[in-house]
């Protein structure tokens, strides 16, 4: 029998996860929940996704907009084997009691506190840790990207210390209230940014320092990475290792892709839905070794890189596949791999 999946929150992440669920051979989308009858609610109806009211007091708003509802979020959660909470940061914590009341395991997004959950999750790094957990946090877009990078390096060479400067987009394309508009902000000014401690929820013993900047861009995040390894491979060997990973894309120098804008254009030309890039995008010519120090640049698409992770987390919690089986199925159905 297919896994019955509910998605609570049908915005940037939720709509992508819902679409991904419908592509899985072992899953069925029970429905999605929205707080308001906006264009995304209309999209859910057009996609024939059963739509539920996330806030009961707003049912009249949906009716006034001519949008038919399948019920309330309580009914959605009750009908599901597992729920993906894709609500804005902080709302997942408010929803936890709802999921517990229905004894439905829940996945939360990286904006929630690690203290909220039993385990933080990355499919490449700690898939098995989520087995039978009631509350699992799929780490943020940046932490997902760093975990995918650090896992093979740790396994193959050992990591003595990681240092990362994250140049973060100011907001997503649809977040008109975010910024900066004309500024470059240390965010935060003090060390570390939250990303290092977040990586430690996946790799508890890893020595990592992170710094963050926010810039007036919406396309992607960019990471400047320095990792001191416990051995001294050459750059070609490291590049080959990273190229072998299923959710990394080493950008060939010959492609002429010199920034996030061309990466998004590349994704559109390849027919990616919403121009999504699920993979870490690593500039191949940036992969350099100085002694035991590795340097590279990578770009992370903040709207989509966690989508395959959510799909894998569903299987991890319910124990329906091992890590390799799940990632292979997810990658094949979504079309991961450039």
From Swiss-Prot:
Going by the UniProt record, its keywords in alphabetical order are: Cytoplasm, Glycolysis, NAD, NADP, Oxidoreductase
Kindly report the protein's main subcellular placement as a broad class.
cytoplasm
Q: Where in the cell is it found?
A: Cytoplasm
* EC nos: 1.2.1.59
Q: Where does D-glyceraldehyde 3-phosphate bind?
A: 140-142, 195-196
Reaction equation(s) it catalyzes: D-glyceraldehyde 3-phosphate + phosphate + NADP(+) = (2R)-3-phospho-glyceroyl phosphate + NADPH + H(+); D-glyceraldehyde 3-phosphate + phosphate + NAD(+) = (2R)-3-phospho-glyceroyl phosphate + NADH + H(+)
The protein's annotated pathway: Carbohydrate degradation; glycolysis; pyruvate from D-glyceraldehyde 3-phosphate: step 1/5
Please cite one Gene Ontology biological process associated with this protein. glycolytic process
Q: Under which main EC class is this enzyme filed?
A: oxidoreductase
Q: Which GO terms describe its cellular component?
A: cytoplasm
Fetch the InterPro entries from UniProt: GlycerAld/Erythrose_P_DH (IPR020831), GlycerAld_3-P_DH_AS (IPR020830), GlycerAld_3-P_DH_cat (IPR020829), GlycerAld_3-P_DH_NAD(P)-bd (IPR020828), Glyceraldehyde-3-P_DH_2_arc (IPR006436), NAD(P)-bd_dom_sf (IPR036291)
Q: Which GO terms describe its molecular function?
A: glyceraldehyde-3-phosphate dehydrogenase (NAD+) (phosphorylating) activity; glyceraldehyde-3-phosphate dehydrogenase (NADP+) (phosphorylating) activity; NAD binding; NADP binding
Task: Tell me which residues bind NAD(+).
Answer: 12-13, 111, 169, 302
Q: Where is the active site?
A: 141
What the record says about family reads: Belongs to the glyceraldehyde-3-phosphate dehydrogenase family.
Subunit comment: Homotetramer.
Q: What is this protein called?
A: Glyceraldehyde-3-phosphate dehydrogenase
Q: Which organism is it from?
A: Natronomonas pharaonis (strain ATCC 35678 / DSM 2160 / CIP 103997 / JCM 8858 / NBRC 14720 / NCIMB 2260 / Gabara)
Q: Which gene encodes it?
A: gap
